Design a protein with these regions (language model features):
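Positively charged n-region of N-terminal signal peptides that target proteins for export
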Residues: 1-4
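Short helix-onset patch at the extreme N-terminus, typifying the N->h transition
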Residues: 6-8
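Amphipathic alpha-helical coiled-coil segments
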Residues: 97-102
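Short S/T/G/P-rich N-terminal loop/turn motif that feeds into the first structured element of a domain
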Residues: 10-74, 81-91, 104-154
Length: 154
């Protein structure tokens, strides 16, 4: 699991370093804890919300929950090609049954937003985090080779 987490964090950092004009990736890196006695509910919720995001948010590039062996710690990785796609996700989430169930099952321990989050996205994330880390230095070979195809995902 450590290697998988390292790979995922490396990939997200790698994607965040993109400097492709059409791609300005935003990453949500979220450490969660399952609320006591909510293990089975949390797993059921994760399955349902993942299917919902996959069906309703085609621009979401990555949406993955990673459970620890003890199942009380969870890492949620979300990757969006741009601010607009991240905002679509937040607009679908805020005030919905998904948000209600999320807070019934999880406590947010750490939430970092990686990438160039605009003011509108930052405002939508205010209830959850104030930890925004913009791109400073980096490169991305994936963006150089696949950036145009990724940006065409609708």
């Amino acid at each position: 699991m450590k290697y998988l987490s390292f790979f995922i964090l490396s990939l997200s950092t790698y994607l965040v370093g993109m400097h492709h004009e059409k791609l300005d990736v935003v990453v949500f890196a979220i450490d969660l804890e399952i609320i006591e006695n909510q293990d089975s509910n949390a797993r059921d919720f994760v399955s349902r919300i993942t299917n919902n995001v996959k069906d309703k948010e085609p621009q979401t590039l990555v949406y993955q929950y990673h459970f620890s062996k003890k199942e009380n710690k969870v890492f949620l990785l979300e990757i969006y090609p741009n601010n607009e796609a991240a905002l679509i996700h937040m607009n679908n989430f805020l005030g919905s049954k998904w948000e209600t169930e999320f807070v019934q099952n999880f406590t947010i321990k750490n939430f970092q937003v990686l990438g160039n989050a605009n003011s509108e996205l930052k405002k939508s994330l205010e209830p959850f985090t104030k930890d925004f880390r913009s791109n400073l230095i980096g490169f991305d070979r994936v963006a150089d080779q696949l950036g145009e195809e990724i940006s065409k995902i609708k």
